[in-house]
Amino acid sequence: MNENVIALDGPAGSGKSTVARQIAEKIGFNYLDTGAFYRALTLYLFRLYQTSPNNRFEEWVKTSEAERSLSQIRIVCEFSAGNENRILLDGEDVSLAIRTPEITREIKHIANRRIYRDFVNKELHSLAKLHKLIMDGRDIGTEVFPDAKFKFYLTASSKVRAERRFLQLQEQGIFADRNEIEKEIILRDKSDMEREIAPLYQAKDAILIDTDILSKNSVISKILEILDQ
């Protein structure tokens, strides 16, 4: 049983990252946003694709050219005060660039391919050997670290999640439309749950928490209580 990893899974916008950051601070763990690795990988591949866009991006990522490029990518996560992750892509700080609606739309084409998931999972396991981590994602407790001692599954309605995402983007100075965000969230949920490889679902031994009906502080208190048991 892995006691150095706490897994928080759930759909996009369910409050995982906000909760995970605060819990990490309270228990002395580092917070790791696993989705940032997929976003950084998507950004890298999308930029490479744009240099010669002969096919649709979703088709291009299946090519040997795209897959071979994995050997050239270097993604680094720097932990900082406040449990913010600074994401460096080949030395460039892309912490904001990976959060744009454009990357959000394209990430599903990366997340549903085994070769890209294996690349990210290898990076996550390397970090877990060096740090005590609380991770949020889609398949942390089901595939990446099925041996994690503590697993939680956070969920919320698509409307509530869209509002959270809208406010987050607004704070970052990124313009977005609430209705479009909700549509993208619904499509992302469908893609995550129905994909062949590592679909989104609640692990049998994960504790379900509905963040629609609980405040952020209530969710944090509930998780801390379980961790103390």
From Swiss-Prot:
The keyword Chaperone does not apply. GO terms for biological process: nucleobase-containing small molecule interconversion; pyrimidine nucleotide metabolic process. Disulfide bonds: none annotated. It catalyses: CMP + ATP = CDP + ADP; dCMP + ATP = dCDP + ADP. GO terms for cellular component: cytosol. Its EC number is 2.7.4.25. Pfam families: Cytidylate_kin. GO terms for molecular function: (d)CMP kinase activity; ATP binding; CMP kinase activity; dCMP kinase activity. It is found in: Cytoplasm. InterPro entries: Cytidylate_kin, Cytidylate_kinase_dom, P-loop_NTPase. Keywords: ATP-binding, Cytoplasm, Kinase, Nucleotide-binding, Transferase. It comes from the Bacteria. SUPFAM superfamilies: P-loop containing nucleoside triphosphate hydrolases. ATP binds at G10, P11, A12, G13, S14, G15, K16, S17, T18. Belongs to the cytidylate kinase family. Type 1 subfamily. PANTHER family: CYTIDYLATE KINASE, CYTIDYLATE KINASE/PANTOATE-BETA-ALANINE LIGASE. This is Cytidylate kinase. It comes from Leptospira interrogans serogroup Icterohaemorrhagiae serovar Lai (strain 56601).
